[in-house]
Amino acid sequence: MESGSDDFLPPPECPVFEPTWAEFRDPLDYITKIRPIAEKSGICKIRPPADWQPPFAVEVDNFRFTPRIQRLNELEAQTRVKLNYLDQIAKFWEIQGSSLKIPNVERRILDLYSLSKIVMEEGGYEAICKDRRWARVAQRLNYPAGKNIGSLLRSHYERIIYPYEMFQSGANLVQCNTYPFDNEEKDKEYKPHGIPLRQSVQPSTFSSYSRRAKRLQPDPEPTEEDIEKNPELKKLQIYGAGPKMMGLGLMAKDKTLRKKDKEGVLCPRAVLMKEEPREDERVMSSLPREDLSHSVEPCTKMTMQLRTHSSAQFIDLYVCRICSRGDEDDKLLLCDGCDDTYHIFCLIPPLPEIPRGVWRCPKCIMAECKRPPEAFGFEQATQEYTLQSFGEMADSFKADYFSMPVHMVPTELVEKEFWRLVSSIEEDVTVEYGADIHSKEFGSGFPVSSSQRILSPEEEEYATSGWNLNVMPVLDQSVLCHINADISGMKVPWLYVGMVFSAFCWHIEDHWSYSINYLHWGEPKTWYGVPSLAAEQLEEVMKRLTPELFDSQPDLLHQLVTLMNPNTLMSHGVPVVRTNQCAGEFVITFPRAYHSGFNQGYNFAEAVNFCTADWLPAGRQCIEHYRRLRRYCVFSHEELICKMAAFPEKLDLNLAVAVHKEMFIMVQEERRLRKALLEKGITEAEREAFELLPDDERQCIKCKTTCFLSALACYDCPDGLVCLSHINDLCKCSSSRQYLRYRYTLDELPAMLHKLKIRAESFDTWANKVRVALEVEDGRKRSFEELRALESEARERRFPNSELLQRLRNCMHEAEACVSQVLGLVSGQEARIQTSPLTLTELRVLLEQMSSLPCAMHQIEDVKEVLEQVEAYQIEAREALASLCPSVGLMRSLLEKGQQLGVDVPEAHQLQQQVEQARWLDDVKKALAPSAQRGSLVIMQGLLVTGTKIASSPCVDKARAELQELLTIAERWEEKAHFCLEARQKHPPATLEAIIREAENIPVHLPNIQALKDALAKAQAWIADVDEIQNGDHYPCLDDLECLVAVGRDLPVSLEELRQLELQVLTAHSWREKASRMFLKKNSCYTLLEVLCPCAHAGSDSSKRRRWIEKELRLYRSCTDTELLGLSAQDLRDPGSVIVAFKEGEQKEKEGILQLRRTNSAKPSPLASSTTASSATSICVCGKVPAGVGTLQCDLCQDWFHGQCVSVPHILSSSRPSPTSSPLLAWWEWDTKFLCPLCMRSRRPRLETILALLVALQRLPVRLPEGEALQCLTERAIVWQGRARQALASKDVTTLLGQLAELRHQLQAETRLQEPYHSTPACAPLREGSGRDMPKQVPGLLPNVDSTSSHEKIASVQGSDLEVLSSLLSQLSGPVLDLPEATRVPLEELMLEGDLLEVTLDENHRIWQLLQAGQPPDLERICTLLELEKPEHKGSRTRGRALEKRRRRQQQEVDLGMKSKNLVQEELQSKKARNSGNKSEEGQEEEEFEEERDSENIFLTCSVDHSSVLKVNPNSVRQNDSGITASFPSLTPLLHQPYPQQDIL
């Protein structure tokens, strides 16, 4: 019975060796060393040193191979026997017209082979039925008892197996008259049997060579219709394994069998049978049963003609071939194979009725079943693979089979599954194996030295390594190096590309040689090995368990196609070991060691054979084994021995000894065989150079052995020859016609043997000389040169590494060591410094060693002389040590004398101790002397450490204690100083001064105390700097204070002034932050100082634009204070210089902007259709040329921009602040003023807010560049405001303002009259005569529209979207004022200067309205602004409600009297209208509003009015400081000047 997968028990592990680098250098020597251990297991594994990693040298892209196909369950011997049995019994029933259906018993298919075998072992069918032992049969088949399974097995046996067994025994052929029939039928297919599969695996495309694939193809006359309609037959349409790796598919009854047989129809011998029927019966019955199938002969043409011409007689001869009667013709049955007839009741067993379909007679069935099976072998796949494609296929197969990643499948699981699959007849798993790939053709995995490619140094190292499989077979110690031919697989490595389950079957190597396998990479390879001592036992077990296979193929184990479960072998006493070979490991198999295995997954291995000296006896035995099996040899063993014997000096000594032994045996055998030849009477002979003949021309025709020393040939039969062991099998010719062909005469062979003996015995001669020299047997010591000559002879003649050679080398090494020590003694002191001196004991041992060496050494006298000097020195030193007060000088002189001896004398140590004590005491006195320079703490600690190492004495102990006490005190003060330097809580200077003062009394240099001194000095210097800067003429600059704060924080001293400075710096930073929030936009690319100072590059358009783009991209470095004002760092500290520089910057800014306006005005308008890009064309901030609709022109620099790239004003932001706002048709009040981001760099807060910042600035005792720039900006704004108010107060301008006010009031009145219409929906029709009560239309305002329609539109605009406002654009006209040239030009200049200010002033807006009213409305700009405002208009309704609520709260605050806050809110409203731009998201506008509220709070929290700003005490500001009243005398009157009465807003 086959064992389950869980029953597999892994055999024990084989030996594993891990050589050192020294052992790894010589591979064959190491293998010889481990052979006694490893040979007992048959195989072993070797792990090279970790850093031995040869590169993979195969050209992966060009490597292509065709693998073999392996069907796993056809590999195992016992499984193959079962499959063969199923094939035969399936064919038996199919021949009779029945289909085999294997039954299921207890939910598993019935093992018919095991059932048949057990029944046979139990005595046969009749005996079992008689004794009623079917229950025992069921028990042996592992079926449970008590279920009446025995009766079921009996019925299956009777129905399926028993008829087949009867045919096999020939019981039904007792009285059958058989006739010759054609033995060469075309139908040699294995017939189907029904074996259910666990996995339905269709044969792959490469199996078209097999019969399994052929069965998938349609037959000439298919019967598929019956199979498809019959569910039972459909279930049996499955595939199993056969003896030639060919599955058998279940088929319906084959109606074409008769037709197929008719093609080679057998002609019954009708005439002969009629005349002598009984004689033919006797002839056939006299033949052996097993020869029945071979006794028939095919019909000849004459027989066919005879049958044709006597067709009438042939019909009359339809008689039963058993009873020879023709009656009861309705019971006669015609054979479809041979056309013989039988009564159905004459057959054994008799048939109840005429069977339907094809029927064959018993002799045809016997002939078909007795046909011998074809030899089993592997097929080649049809698909060619590369390494990559094969690896992808292999990994995919393994991952799909185990349903997990390939690297996660345990090796134990793969091993159990492999042995389950090969033992299963139910599952048919097919894999591919790239085996026996020639490295000569495809390239080796190891680097190989060749002229095709130059190797790197690393590759060259591995190319010459003995472990390179291309090098190992041809090493000097290897036998195969003496074979000239490149034997593939033996001398030339083979490559193996494996996948999971791909296997190599049980086998031994050719000629029983060694083999070595190296796994280059990939998943492990599992090996099983059997030692050579159990090789015959393994063969016997396999033959005993599967005799059916070995009967037809006696050399089955030599074909590498058969496996057997290691557990089965072990259960029969065969010792088996296993191992998993991982990447980078070697596996070695020993001579005649059977081995097999399989691959765990995708991998790449390389293998080759090699033969050492110990293999020669096994090689000779292998030739005898091959001779018995009549197997061909790979090479001639005799030729190999003779070739090595011809050049004995080139042989390794161990190899020479082994060859001599083999040569001696071979010569003795040759003498015996040639003597037998002479006794037979063969005397003719001729010399033949067998090595020049092809192997197939010198093979023995009997045993297939390759001849070399001699062979027997015949003059009359020149085509063949035999070896001398088969001289009787050559031919039948007379002995006189036979002659001997020989290679060497019997006299030449002993001469070759003698040369080998000399080479083999040369070691004995040399060994005798060495033994005499080492043991001084003749009483004479050899010189060192003589011993060296003996060692050189062993090395040159390659003697083995024996114990005697090792003794010789050890003796030479000892002599060399003694000579080296003697040279150290007698040489100068400089040479002795390199080595440690000898002790007195070692000197005496050296003298004794030199005397005992078997080598004569003349240096022994020098050693004796040194020993005498040492003994005399000992006496003198003892006398000096014994005196009471030895002088230091005497002891030092004796010490130097002892050092010159080169010997370590014990008295010298005592002298050394006393000298060291005196030297150490002297060093301590010098270090602690008052006049000496203070030593460092490290020096004192070093003295203490040195004192602990010297020998103890009263003086030394006292000095050591004093030094220890001093160090303890010093370390305590060092710790205090360290605590002061590192502690988080800093100490005041007075504390530090006290610590330093006390530490001055310690006579040691203390590093931490010195650091504390330095820190205190720095602190005092810092205090002086603070006093100096605080008492100067001006307030200190913020940069100076920050530097002082940074320095003060790093000092380990508590400084009271530091807290004051930190507070001042913090206050200054807070003021700067508030100013930045007030002026700078969100995410502005400008600094506060850049915004407050005049634009230095206002006149350069390209420079200005480039810098702006760089700042937007965060590539621009902000200008420093000195760059902005053009002043040095020293001038910045002078307020007067800052004011002058600011004034100059104003003038440059104005001149630059005028130049820029002229330049930009000359550029073509983007709105013109003919505008083309040129050097004079405007460039937007996005870097592109603005063109077409959606472009805006800056009112300051006159340059053009895309409306989507810049922030644009909201046209109705100031026109409709409330329901009582000015009407829509007052277009001159619309906020259409556009300043580009290059001109409007900040938020431009209102002047009142800035004044609050200035008040906070006066309270700071710190000077900031931004503060002085803000003062200059404020003065500039106030000066401009005064000029603007003066211009607005002139008579002409006042008149114009009155006209605008009148127009505005008129439009407001009209709007109030339309208020009843506000509640009317925009889509409702207007009442008739609704315009009767309306005031008269203002002339020139809407000339083409009547009042009714205009009022309707005005009312609808107030409650609708901007589309209504867009519809009014065509009705606008102007100008509404007549603005004279004399009035307009001054206003435009003021407008220009006001736009340059980064401050919001109401006068600026009034001047803008006057200039707008004095010119026609800019419809193109208005259209552009409306178009840009539309996308965000819907989303702004909700935001408008929230902002309106805030404005109402602000209005309530105004009503309570908070005028300053009201001004700020108005400023925010106007600024909101101008600077809202393209921000369409509600969050952005609300954030901006909150930031502006923060700016307002700065002003509100100050709680000051204008009068408080004017009442600054000049005495509180230092002389020439940057105060408001000191620097800006014009500030006071301008702040209190009232606004004009004509307030348009």
UniProtKB/Swiss-Prot annotation:
Compositionally biased tracts (Basic residues): 1436-1449
Domain JmjN: residue ranges: 14-55
Major enzyme class: oxidoreductase
Pfam families (UniProt xref): ARID, JmjC, JmjN, KDM5_C-hel, PHD, PLU-1, zf-C5HC2
KW Repeat (keyword) present: yes
Source organism, top-level taxon: Eukaryota
Binding site for Fe cation: 507, 509, 595
Zinc fingers (PHD-type), renumbered ranges: 317-367, 1177-1242
Catalysis: reaction(s): N(6),N(6),N(6)-trimethyl-L-lysyl(4)-[histone H3] + 3 2-oxoglutarate + 3 O2 = L-lysyl(4)-[histone H3] + 3 formaldehyde + 3 succinate + 3 CO2
Protein keywords: Chromatin regulator, Dioxygenase, Iron, Isopeptide bond, Metal-binding, Nucleus, Oxidoreductase, Phosphoprotein, Repeat, Ubl conjugation, Zinc, Zinc-finger
Entry text on domains: The JmjC domain is required for enzymatic activity.
Family note: Belongs to the JARID1 histone demethylase family.
Name under which the protein is recorded: Lysine-specific demethylase 5D
Gene: KDM5D
